[in-house]
């Protein structure tokens, strides 16, 4: 998955602190690897809206079988991740491969709807996203076969063995678990935005940790079947 952004230089607080002004690489910055990895894996919109820190930086790190890269020249920024050692194959099994081109500067945001006041030499384009979904050809293993489906403890939902392993790694099977750092919650450690995309209407906007186990299981199965195991860093 690779994202390339051309937009404002506003930073979001994602746990990255520049070691020196201007340019920072992996050795010059203190990186919250777990949080950045979780945001990248879940295709969090905040990574597209703004860079992870102000100024130019070049941050690359490996985390749990994937290599992550975040880069900015101070104006344009990009981020991507791939399975370690298989960067060229990642696009083939990725649930989502998106390219975002945003040519709106911070000074132009307020005047996007006032085309009559645009400078003749400036071209303003609203952010556009092209998303391509590829079938999961390598990400899932034989563990996801129907012969291995079993209802999880305390739930009537059939959860395949791969998802059960993910739940154990993410939360130890605790349906009320909450990560105070990233805000991920529940048995499968959903981010709120991801949860809202797969949860039943009555549980949208509610913390996953407050939903019954069978509701969490059903949401996880839906996400697994539509987006693949790559949605979880521990997969």
Swiss-Prot record:
Enzyme class: hydrolase
GO molecular function annotation: hydrolase activity, acting on glycosyl bonds
Top-level taxon: Bacteria
Compartments reported by the entry: Secreted
Signal peptide: 1-26
Record's keyword terms, sorted: Glycosidase, Hydrolase, Secreted, Signal
InterPro entries from the UniProt entry: Lysozyme-like_dom_sf, RPF
Keyword Secreted: yes
Low complexity bias locations: 111-159
CDD domains assigned to the protein according to its UniProt record, in alphabetical order: RPF (cd13925)
Spans through the membrane: none
Biological function: Is able to cleave peptidoglycan and affects clumping and separation of bacterial cells.
Similarity comment text for this entry: Belongs to the transglycosylase family. SceD subfamily.
Protein name per its UniProtKB record: Probable transglycosylase SceD
Gene this protein is translated from: sceD
């Amino acid at each position: 998955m690779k994202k390339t952004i051309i937009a404002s230089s506003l930073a979001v607080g994602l746990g990255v602190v520049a070691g020196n002004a201007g340019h920072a690489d992996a050795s010059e910055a203190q990186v919250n690897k777990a949080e950045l990895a979780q945001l990248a894996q879940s295709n969090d919109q905040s990574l597209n809206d703004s860079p992870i820190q102000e100024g130019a930086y070049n941050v690359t790190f490996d985390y749990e079988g994937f290599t992550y890269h975040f880069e900015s020249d101070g104006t344009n920024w990009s981020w991507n991740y791939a399975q370690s050692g298989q960067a060229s194959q990642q696009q083939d099994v990725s649930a989502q491969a998106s390219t975002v081109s945003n040519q709106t500067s911070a000074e132009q945001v307020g005047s996007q709807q006032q085309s009559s006041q645009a400078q003749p030499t400036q071209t303003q384009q609203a952010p556009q996203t092209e998303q391509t979904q590829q079938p999961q050809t390598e990400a899932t293993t034989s563990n996801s076969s129907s012969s291995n489906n079993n209802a999880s403890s305390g739930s009537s939902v059939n959860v395949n063995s791969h998802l059960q392993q993910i739940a154990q790694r993410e939360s130890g099977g605790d349906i009320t678990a909450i990560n105070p750092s990233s805000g991920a919650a529940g048995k499968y450690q959903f981010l709120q935005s991801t949860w809202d995309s797969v949860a039943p209407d009555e549980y949208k906007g509610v913390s996953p940790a407050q939903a019954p186990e069978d509701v969490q299981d059903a949401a996880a199965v839906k996400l697994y079947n539509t987006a693949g195991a790559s949605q979880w860093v521990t997969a």
